[in-house]
Amino acid sequence: MLCFIQGMFLITSSSCGYALRTSKDAPRFSQWGVRRVYIRPIQNETFRAGVENSVYTQTVRMLSSTPGLRSVNSPEDADAELVGTVSLAQRTVSGETKASDLNPKNLGSPLLLVASEYTASLACSFALTQKGKILWSGEFRRSRPFPANSQVGALGSTGALINESEFERALGEVAADMMVDVRSSLTQDF
């Protein structure tokens, strides 16, 4: 029993540099005098309607989980404002296959290439401002592959609608992944 107690004492007293964070662990924000942040509506500079909503939702989630910070509903109640812009939201073909390989009856042309995979890309920039002064800013870009619906000659095929739906879902996931980078940069968690 004494060995067990000594072992536990050694384990707890020898620190490896990791510790649980508390809500008071926000030295960077304390230095700036920031505890409450207003998130401005995200600006959309792309031709992709609605992408700013996914980014805004993920930004609110990220800020809500950041120790020492609290999101507020009006700029008057805030110590600082987080401003964001979406500069790129697109999908590109990242995998192709011959149309004749997709149809068992070989109705498709062997010369016609059909997308079998896309890559969703998202680029955003953010800035934390206080009374017109920029406290922090950063630009972020993330991508993620997603499968394409490549049915050829199928009656009632809704390939375009399915691809569009998958793209929307992938953009939401990319935005969530991007917020990990934003939070790390904002809080300097390395």
Describe the function of each predicted region.
Residues 14-68, 73-76, 154, 183-190:
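A structural "domain/chain start" motif
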Residues 1-14:
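Sec-dependent bacterial lipoprotein signal peptides
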Residues 47, 51, 116, 166, ...:
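Conserved acidic
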Residues 52, 56, 60, 86, ...:
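Extracytoplasmic/secreted envelope proteins and their assembly/folding machinery
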Residues 157-190:
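Compositionally biased, intrinsically disordered linkers/stalks adjacent to structured regions
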